[in-house]
Amino acid sequence: MRPQILLLLALLTLGLAAQRQDKVPCKMVDKKVSCQGLGLLQVPSVLPPDTETLDLSGNQLRSILASPLGFYTALRHLDLSTNEISFLQPGAFQALTHLEHLSLAHNRLAMATALSAGGLGPLPRVTSLDLSGNSLYSGLLERLLGEAPSLHTLSLAENSLTRLTRHTFRDMPVLEQLDLHSNVLMDIEDGAFEGLPRLTHLNLSRNSLTCISDFSLQQLRVLDLSCNSIEAFQTASQPQAEFQLTWLDLRENKLLHFPDLAALPRLIYLNLSNNLIRLPTGPPQDSKGIHAPSEGWSALPLSTPSWNASARPLSQLLNLDLSYNEIELIPDSFLEHLTSLCFLNLSRNCLRTFEARRSGSLPCLMLLDLSHNALETLELGARALGSLRTLLLQGNALRDLPPYTFANLASLQRLNLQGNRVSPCGGPDEPGPSGCVAFSGITSLHSLSLVDNEIELLRAGAFLHTPLTELDLSSNPGLEVATGALGGLEASLEVLALQGNGLTVLQVDLPCFICLKRLNLAENRLSHLPAWTQAVSLEVLDLRNNSFSLLPGSAMGGLETSLRRLYLQGNPLSCCGNGWLAAQLHQGRVDVDATQDLICRFSSQEEVSLSHVRPEDCEKGGLKNINLIIILTFILVSAILLTTLATCCCVRRQKFNQQYKA
């Protein structure tokens, strides 16, 4: 009898436990439990004991106690982020012997009650720890961090750390990734990272560092120093081993010169944008070096670097960003050693000239951004830049270039010349005036922008034998497009823009461009289009701010199967006679922009929304017009008859008077 009673009690206990679990609002899937954003004040005590993943983020937890957290000994992932935790009971995580990932981000660990003896305590199997956003300061951090022999990733971002010492990181022998971004770090003591022999990724961005003069982390592969106040960067003078650094970010600092990178031969990514760099450069002649404010990485005065020596070891560099600096000149000797470079950004500098004349110069370069400088001259050698695919030159002052400047670039696919003063030559039979640039015969070029170049005449054959797919000739007021100017593009052109040119007549046989998908003719003075009588590929047609009153079906019929979007605002559209357009609106085959606000006019000059026009409105208008014509015709015929009758009467009266006198 007694065993039966015990069994009954056990079943009742399990039933009550199951009933209590059913009342918990957390979501449970397999061994994963999510209690995110439920307003909980404490860790639930009725969850399955075999839970491996527990998400308690976004609640109102203020303290973490060993019980009931210790009940869930199978936990591997524990997320306690975005709470109000200010108290950690000693040994709170001691029972979680399988815990691998722990997040305490965005809590209140900096409050005094979080500093109970032992801090976090030992975390023997934790590989990922997030303590970001807790207002932690340097002294507190050393007391909070415990032994973590398996830790690979540690985030201390968005805290209040001002200094790193040789005691900050200890008992973390396998740490690989350390995130310290968005603190207030001003000093890094010598040996601060000596206890991290496997550290490969270090993020120190958005701090208050002013100088790096003794960088000695040979094992590091990725270093982010962006958004500080660094004036100089220099490696240790006698490193114990070869540096492994491949990724270095120094953007948004106060660098005055190109850093000395002679000891970093493996570097493949270098970002120096948004600094004060000039080439060639260095400290003023009377300078004795730039001194750091304290010991450590910033301990020694910096020697004046040589830009030539700095560039020489960068033979493996793939990406170099020097945008937003004060560079006025790029010496040839600086570029000649960058034999692996694929991406070079020199935009937003003070360049007036750029030269790459040497044979084999920058052989691997695929993208060159020289936009928004003050370039007046551009000299590219016949065998230079052999791999260049994208050349960005917008926002410069280029004019009177050598005619074959771009024809020599054998791999060029995309060219942006917006905002210059470049005039295209014509085809072989019409070369054009002195100073024009040839765009014909560039067999690799697919995309060309000549926006805002003050082009007056686009000559016949300007792009002959150049298989362009995108051509933008917008914002050239007064542009005259000669007959045959776009000849040769009929089988390749997909995007054509002629916006804002003041065109009254379009001397382009558009229906012949069988691949054309996007056509922009906005902000001109056009009133007629060529007739598309056969099916084409056009999907988007922009006719805004022109002089169109009618879009007859006889001209637009060929677009019915392909056209998807039509822009018509700003045209004096007629409400009647636009049967094709009305059909598109009512059938929904074409997305006409802002149909509720698209205005049209009746013959009486009455303006209404085009979408509100009904067929009978035009029929009434037609009947009114017919009646008016009939009345006018009757009046005219009556006037003619009366005039004729009066004339006959006058003639007969004259004859009668003559006979009477006789």
Swiss-Prot record:
Main location: membrane
Membrane topology: Single-pass type I membrane protein
Keywords assigned: Cell membrane, Disulfide bond, Glycoprotein, Growth factor binding, Leucine-rich repeat, Membrane, Repeat, Signal, Transmembrane, Transmembrane helix
Superkingdom of origin: Eukaryota
LRR repeat positions: 50-73, 74-95, 98-119, 125-145, 150-171, 174-195, 198-219, 220-240, 244-265, 266-286, 316-339, 340-361, 364-385, 387-408, 411-432, 444-465, 467-488, 492-513, 515-536, 537-558
Transmembrane residue ranges: 626-646
Family designation: Belongs to the LRRC32/LRRC33 family.
Protein name according to UniProt: Transforming growth factor beta activator LRRC32
Source organism phylogeny: Eukaryota, Metazoa, Chordata, Craniata, Vertebrata
